[in-house]
Regions:
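Conserved catalytic cores of very large enzyme subunits
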Residues: 2-189, 225-228, 232-765
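Extended non-globular scaffold/tether segments
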Residues: 190-201
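Extended amphipathic alpha-helical scaffold segments
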Residues: 203-211, 273-277
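A conserved hydrophobic secondary-structure block that centers on an alpha-helix together
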Residues: 214-221
Length: 765
């Protein structure tokens, strides 16, 4: 890492995070002027107004220009989506348990007196609340499932970066002008053209700023850098990039611009090493210093950490630690099935090893063709302990997409958005994370409904749980589709849509079914706890008959605080096998019920003509979802977290080693989970020491690939180190750990999430 990159890192985290009202005020000012116009044009004009008037900056020593806010890591508001939670939490931002922000008293006043009164009863949230039935509201209030994405615009998507970089904005504007001439009444084309032209003007503002700064700069080297930024910006406003620096700059400008449009999570990076390779090679051919090109890439990686999302207190518990979702996958396959690993794949990992920050959320695609040098580079990066890169298995993901009707060429081009959500870059609107489904809560409801049922059998209970899962999936789909329609009618994203196939051919926004592939991704959470509970209940009550069903239910209601409660809990934990130990009897319960969940989910269509797709990953939602479930037959206390990850065993229950964990997960049909899965693994640093440790990890990754698991990720850290960080956070400000599908600064996590990471079983190879 160069001295410049070190200073950029330090500067990024030097100040307290603040909330900026600038986007909200500019958006609102435009909206007041466009009453009565079509929604998509109002949205486009509001975003264009922001691009014209928002304050811009180029920070000291930056090589890549473009900042969403002048102050680093500031949160921005979207009151047009949901103004109510913002009003409710204005006074809580600086002191809440997770993801704190400072906000001035004057900004609070402005929000209360100017912004909220305008958006009250005008927001997307008002529409959604007005459409939700009482039954759906009741299910969400008890957290049987959550309906997400009601407070921000659409993200969780990868735009067609090759189209942007290989054509350039000037050519894209010309193409859109033709569409407008051919269909002058099409509001989508009008909105997209308006925003493409506004993007050009916004980039030119940076060119002018860089020139002004250069004129006042007394340092010769910095003056030259600023003039180069100005030259690159003027080029990018009209022409396609020719060099790596130009490509990185246009890439970042567009990402920032899209943030203004939607203020969304996970505008992910896709297959960065594939579409950026020609520009990297061109710069090398032109004689650029490889060390400088690496510094450019490191600069870009640092920039990815400048964007943080302002979430509600509740949402911050589900998505703790700013999982911005700048996810990129490296390696993988070409469209004709060959290995796609290239020199930039290596450089992306090298640059990450230098910066070691939570973003970008890099992943590596493994397959039978992956070469040993790249696998060793991957293992070397994992060993650093930041949880990056995560690993995805082509041998599972490609067939999973084929099963969903995706072409073979497109399936081989898959990447990931957000945490682990599978997507086809530039062709998919997957509405990932639209809902999370609490499988253990459903079981708890069934247990309580059977109190006093002397005729209850295990098979009867299992059938009731299946039926109840099906019932609540129906309600989850209903709520998700209302939210989907809300985005269509209230929050279209025409600029984003202009970079998604086949929106231009159809003349429709992604929210209106314009994309080639239209999915709605929902997560089933708690499968490990569900199978552990049912296996123990079956043994204790129906086979061994040590307790009647009602007697066990009484112990659970009392949270094991009965005269025999602790003995009962000890037996439930210690006498009955748990998922994650390669025990068919309990693993098969997981496999059967997860398959049932998946098959029920995939029955349903969304308003865009696509289908719902199941996944199993938690982000950090296993903590809040566990808080609403009482004591359960796996020995879990009331309110205790659920198993982390998605397919991971419950904390402390994977007693037979890592190989057993992998074998348990391999018994689940990973190809059904086409919205993504997540498996957390924690290693002690000592087990990966030296060349031998790296080779063991590389061999382990090959075994993972052969076992046909979809995903795996790693923490490499001692629990003692994490406990010390809890006690002395000022000494561990740079400690990065894996949470669930993303990495975060350990000291920025709430204590409940920190404790969860500490308690995970540490394995050895």
């Amino acid at each position: 890492m160069t001295n410049r990159i070190s200073r950029l890192k330090t500067a990024l985290f030097a100040n307290t995070r603040e909330i900026s009202l600038e986007r909200a005020l500019l958006y609102t000012a435009s909206h007041r002027q466009t009453e009565g116009e079509p929604v998509i044009l109002r949205r486009a004009k509001a975003t264009a107004y922001i691009l014209e008037h928002v304050e811009i900056s180029i920070r000291d020593e930056e090589l890549i220009a473009g900042n969403r806010t002048v102050k680093p890591r500031a949160g921005i508001m979207s009151p047009e989506m949901d103004p109510y939670w913002l009003l409710k939490e204005l006074d809580q931002f600086p002191t809440r348990p997770q993801d704190r922000f400072a906000i001035s008293e004057e900004d609070k006043r402005i929000y209360r007196e100017e912004l909220f009164p305008y958006w009250e009863k005008r927001s997307m949230k008002d529409f959604i609340n007005g459409q939700m039935t009482d039954e759906v509201k009741a299910a969400t209030s008890t957290q049987i499932f959550s309906i997400n994405q009601t407070d921000k615009g659409q993200g969780h998507i990868i735009i067609d970066y090759p189209r942007l970089l290989n054509h350039g904005l000037g050519e894209l504007v010309a193409q859109m002008q033709q569409h407008c001439q051919q269909q002058p009444e099409n509001h989508f084309y009008q909105a997209a053209l308006l925003l493409l032209e506004a993007s050009q003007k916004h980039i030119l503002r940076y060119a002018e700023l860089a020139e002004t700064m250069a004129a006042n700069c007394t340092d010769a080297q910095r003056r030259e850098e600023l003039l180069t930024i100005a030259e690159i910006s003027r080029h990018n406003a009209e022409h396609k990039p020719q060099t790596f620096w130009q490509a990185c700059q246009l890439f970042w400008y567009m990402n920032i611009i899209l943030q203004y449009e939607s203020n969304a999570s996970s505008l992910s990076l896709g297959r960065f090493d594939q579409y950026m390779l020609p520009f990297y090679q061109a710069s090398l051919t032109q004689g650029e210093d490889p060390a400088f090109l690496k510094e450019l890439l490191e600069s870009l990686w640092v920039k990815c950490n400048d964007i943080v999302l302002l979430r509600s207190t509740s949402s911050a518990r589900y998505f703790a630690g700013f999982p911005t979702g700048y996810t990129a996958l490296l390696g993988g396959l070409t469209e004709n099935g060959r290995s796609a690993v290239n020199v930039l794949s290596f450089l992306c990992l090298d640059a990450y090893q230098s910066v070691q920050l939570p973003q970008p959320n890099l992943g590596v695609r493994t397959n039978a063709l992956i070469d040993t040098p790249f696998l060793m580079k991957t293992a070397e990066t994992i060993r650093l302990g930041t949880g990056i890169p995560q690993i995805f298995n082509d041998e599972v993901v490609v067939p999973a997409f084929l099963n969903r009707g995706v072409s073979l060429e497109d399936a081989r081009d898959y990447s990931v958005v957000g945490c682990v959500e599978l997507s086809i870059p530039g062709r998919t609107y997957g509405l990932h994370d639209i809902a999370m489904f609490n499988l253990l809560k459903v079981m708890e409801i069934c247990l309580h409904e059977n109190e006093g049922n002397a005729a209850l059998t295990y098979e009867g209970l299992l059938e009731q749980i299946r039926a109840k899962i099906s019932h609540y999936i129906t309600l989850m789909v209903e709520g998700s589709n209302i939210c989907d329609i809300g985005h269509r009618d209230w929050a279209p994203v025409p600029l984003l849509s202009s970079f998604i196939s086949d929106c231009l051919e159809k003349g429709r926004d992604i929210t209106d079914g314009g994309a080639r592939y239209n999915f709605s991704g929902v997560q089933g959470i708690g499968i490990a706890n569900l199978s552990d509970s049912l296996h123990a209940l079956k043994g204790m009550v129906f086979e061994q008959q040590r307790l009647s069903f009602d007697e066990l239910l009484s112990v659970l209601k009392a949270n094991f605080a009965t005269p025999e409660g602790e003995k009962v809990r000890a037996r439930l934990i210690n006498r009955f096998e748990k998922y994650g130990n390669d025990i068919d009897e309990v693993d098969n319960i997981s496999a059967e019920l997860l398959r049932h969940y998946c098959k029920e989910v995939e029955k349903y269509q969304n308003p865009r003509g696509g289908y719902f797709t199941p996944g199993s990953y938690t982000v950090s939602a296993h903590v809040p979802l566990g808080s609403v479930v009482g004591a359960t037959p796996d020995g879990r206390f009331a309110g205790e977290q659920l198993a982390d990850g998605g397919l991971s065993p419950m904390l402390g229950q994977d007693a037979q080693g890592l190989t057993a964990v992998l074998k348990s997960v391999s018994k689940l049909d990973n190809t059904l989970l086409s919205n993504g899965t997540l498996l957390n693994v924690k290693f002690t640093p000592a087990t990966l020491e030296g060349e031998a440790g790296l080779r063991k990890l590389a061999d382990f990754l090959r075994a993972f690939t052969q076992l046909k698991l979809q995903h795996i990720q790693f923490n490499v850290v001692n629990a003692d180190t994490l406990r010390e960080a809890q006690q002395r956070p000022q000494d561990y400000a740079g400690l990065v750990v894996r949470v669930a599908g993303y990495s975060a600064f350990f000291v920025e996590l709430s204590k409940e999430i920190q404790d969860d990471i500490i308690r995970r079983t540490a394995h050895q190879l």
